Amino acid sequence: MISKADVVVGLAWGDEAKGKITSYLASKLDRDGRPHYSLVARWAGGNNAGHTVYVNGRRYKTHLVPSGVFHGISSLVGPACVLHPESFQGELDYLANEGFDTSLVKVHPNCHIVKDEFLDFDKQNLAEKLGTTSRGIAPSYAAKAGRTGILAKDVLSKDLLWNGELKGNVLCEGAQGVWLDLDQGNYPYVTSSTTLPYGACSLGFPTQKIDRVWGAAKIYDTRSGEDPLFPQSLLDNPELSRLGQIGQEYGVTTGRRRKVNWLNLDLLCRSVSLTGATDVVISKCDVLSELGVFKLYYKGDLISFNTIGEMKSHVFASVTQCSNLVQSITFSSSPEGI
């Protein structure tokens, strides 16, 4: 029986270091020296997501395989995910060649399959209009909703399929972010699945089992794909362009240059409240420090600060005021940990 579930969720538009946070949490040991979590599970999305993880100083990039594999923990691709078999196998081969035990990675039998024809449809009809990753995600979820999809149990070999049960402590690794949620985001410039913590329950446990919700954000905002909230003109702003260069803001999945803007603190506070985040990790503070310009949007105004310390204090006070569920706020300056 499952003891508890901790959920890692993005508080913005994705690319908030959820993989880093998940890897950090997955590395934790109990007093007896055993891993704190018995399972790390992806609960939504497909290989449109990109997670960057550092292990022993080396960088690894994944798309669908959960981050538990980096720490010898069973890892599950859940039933609400969508999976392209060839791409998934390529990711497993990559990790196996790097020395990781990919036999720990399993796929839920009810996970839906991304067919090649969905990739073609995505490229021809959605990529330019909405800025999708052309990974066939939307057509796959459309087929699922229309009950014409294909399940993993009908395609994948039995050795890849999960036949276990949820037990112990489960770490749920989210994809994308709150403002890409199908219902809460700026529709139609959204993803095709839920990105809110309750979506983790699709793994097969009640909401009462959710213990901590780790919310991931950055000290500035970034966006991949099309969205009127992030106009093309942002790419021409010298300070923001420099910030993107320092932060290496290019998509893990597509390699596309991300649009960068100053932190919208009002939206961050809304996403903290919406997700019920108990622990907030704000990354890339080292990047903003290197730029030496400290700005954010607050109540509709662009505010400047003399130091990053002043800016952090303002963010801390605002976030703690917007939700009484927040127990910790961490400002991270390391790509490898929190």
Q: What would you call each of these model-derived segments?
A:
Residues 1-338:
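Non-transmembrane, aqueous-exposed alpha-helical and coiled segments at domain scale
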